């Protein structure tokens, strides 16, 4: 294991290399007088060997190591707390600006998924989601997104029998498309063969429907897409997801269709996320309506039993009602699954992430 550098007293004008994707690292290194191939060497040290001490990077020239020390540093925010569920799910908590964000690790037999946060809090105020009730502080930097993966990988290699992360989902705290540039840069690092080296189909970005940003994403990057729909019509969606009053279902799904036409990662269809709320969006007629609005969009529907959080005014649909709802959709030809609750006992399940946020949004 490599000895870590002391990051105290680092000047603000130094660059955290975890904020830079490949192209940006290459430009930075060229400015230091390094050759282009040094980009690969440096990224391997950072992401494959988890080394944040330039002095230990033995295949870099001494003068380049000196310049790197003078102009930059490598710092991944530490996890300050770990909670482990009876089902093996792990919640890691990171302190940023004296606030807390949450990262979830979900191990399964054939895969291991890391759910990362993209913002400190969330501004969308979806009524069924704990994160939305906490308010919003700021976007995470690229390094703060990447730190979650960097630290998780490090822990898994050291403590969990050399386990690896096979999938990364942007389904933690925040709306990824409201932090578009930083999320795209982070995804580039995740995709890079000398970064985390995941394929585009193993990275999932979930959005509640920020239509202009989704339209921009079409030209920027191709990853698996999940849409937080949660209602079959605008009337219901307006009542539980205020963002729908700005970007309604029709405009959202039109944007999704455009993305799918340009995507190789979504050949199997977009994942439609639908939280099950008793008496609100779970009736047979809602299933029929959902099938109708999705009939022209290749999709897989994931029904999510609602997870309780304090002061919420919802009740989860019964198992029987969820099964009936799922079967209606299956008869209409949709690949429909029911999400298994993971990490519910440690507040790590879908919609339960709260962190500790200083809200900067005025009501």
From Swiss-Prot:
Residues that hold [4Fe-4S] cluster according to the record:
122, 126, 129
Q: Where are the transmembrane segments?
A: none
Explain how, and how many, cofactor molecules are bound.
Answer: Binds 1 [4Fe-4S] cluster. The cluster is coordinated with 3 cysteines and an exchangeable S-adenosyl-L-methionine.
Q: What is its EC number?
A: 2.1.1.192
User: Which enzyme type, at the first EC level?
Assistant: transferase
Q: What are the record keywords, sorted?
A: 4Fe-4S, Cytoplasm, Disulfide bond, Iron, Iron-sulfur, Metal-binding, Methyltransferase, rRNA processing, S-adenosyl-L-methionine, Transferase, tRNA processing
Disulfide feature: 115-350
User: What cofactor(s) does the depicted protein rely on?
Assistant: [4Fe-4S] cluster
A single Gene Ontology biological process assigned to it is: tRNA methylation
Q: Which residues form the active site?
A: 102 (proton acceptor), 350 (s-methylcysteine intermediate)
One GO CC term on file: cytoplasm
Q: What is its main location?
A: cytoplasm
Give the molecular function GO annotations. Answer: 4 iron, 4 sulfur cluster binding; metal ion binding; rRNA (adenine(2503)-C2-)-methyltransferase activity; rRNA binding; tRNA (adenine(37)-C2)-methyltransferase activity; tRNA binding
The cellular location(s) given in this protein's UniProt record come to:
Cytoplasm
- Cross-referenced PROSITE patterns: RADICAL_SAM
Catalytic activity line of the entry: adenosine(2503) in 23S rRNA + 2 reduced [2Fe-2S]-[ferredoxin] + 2 S-adenosyl-L-methionine = 2-methyladenosine(2503) in 23S rRNA + 5'-deoxyadenosine + L-methionine + 2 oxidized [2Fe-2S]-[ferredoxin] + S-adenosyl-L-homocysteine; adenosine(37) in tRNA + 2 reduced [2Fe-2S]-[ferredoxin] + 2 S-adenosyl-L-methionine = 2-methyladenosine(37) in tRNA + 5'-deoxyadenosine + L-methionine + 2 oxidized [2Fe-2S]-[ferredoxin] + S-adenosyl-L-homocysteine
Please name the InterPro entries in this protein's record: Aldolase_TIM, Methyltransferase_A, RlmN_N, RNA_MTrfase_RlmN, rRNA_lsu_MTrfase_RlmN/Cfr, rSAM
Q: Which residues form the Radical SAM core domain?
A: 108-349
Binding annotation for S-adenosyl-L-methionine = 174-175, 206, 228-230, 307
Q: What does this protein do?
A: Specifically methylates position 2 of adenine 2503 in 23S rRNA and position 2 of adenine 37 in tRNAs. m2A2503 modification seems to play a crucial role in the proofreading step occurring at the peptidyl transferase center and thus would serve to optimize ribosomal fidelity.
Q: Which family does it belong to?
A: Belongs to the radical SAM superfamily. RlmN family.
Other remarks in the entry:
Reaction proceeds by a ping-pong mechanism involving intermediate methylation of a conserved cysteine residue.
Q: List the protein's name.
A: Dual-specificity RNA methyltransferase RlmN
């Amino acid at each position: 294991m490599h000895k870590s550098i002391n990051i105290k007293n680092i000047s603000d004008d130094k660059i955290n290399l975890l904020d830079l994707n490949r192209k940006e690292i290459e430009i930075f290194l060229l400015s230091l007088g390094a050759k282009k191939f040094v980009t690969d060497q440096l990224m391997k040290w950072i992401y494959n060997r988890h080394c944040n001490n330039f002095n230990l990077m033995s295949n870099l020239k001494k003068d380049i190591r000196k310049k790197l020390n003078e102009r930059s540093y490598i710092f991944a925010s530490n996890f300050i707390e770990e909670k482990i569920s009876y089902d093996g799910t792990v919640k890691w908590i990171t302190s940023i600006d004296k606030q807390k964000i949450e990262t979830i690790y979900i191990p399964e037999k054939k895969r291991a998924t890391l759910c990362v946060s993209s913002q400190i809090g969330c501004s969308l105020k979806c009524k069924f989601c704990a994160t939305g009730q906490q308010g919003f502080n700021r976007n995470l930097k690229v390094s703060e997104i990447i730190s979650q993966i960097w630290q998780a990988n490090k822990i898994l290699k050291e403590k969990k029998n050399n386990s690896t992360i096979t999938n990364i989902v942007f389904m933690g705290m925040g709306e990824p498309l409201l932090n578009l540039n930083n999320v795209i840069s982070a995804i580039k690092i995740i995709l890079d063969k000398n970064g985390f080296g995941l394929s585009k189909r193993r990275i999932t970005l979930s959005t509640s429907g920020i239509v202009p940003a989704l339209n921009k994403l079409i030209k920027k990057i191709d990853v698996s897409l999940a849409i937080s729909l949660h209602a079959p019509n605008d009337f219901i969606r307006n009542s539980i997801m205020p963002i729908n009053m700005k970007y309604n279902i029709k405009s959202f799904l039109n944007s999704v269709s455009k993305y799918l036409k340009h995507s190789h990662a979504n050949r199997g269809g977009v994942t439609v996320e639908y939280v099950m709320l008793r008496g609100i969006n779970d009736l047979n007629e809602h299933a029929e309506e959902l099938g109708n609005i999705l009939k022209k969009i290749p999709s897989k529907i994931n029904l999510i039993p609602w997870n309780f959080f304090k002061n919420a005014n919802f009740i989860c649909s019964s198992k029987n009602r969820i099964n009936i709802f799922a079967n209606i959709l299956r008869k209409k030809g949709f690949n429909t699954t029911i999400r298994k609750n993971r990490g519910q006992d440690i507040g790590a399940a879908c919609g339960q992430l709260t962190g500790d946020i200083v809200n900067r949004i005025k009501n």
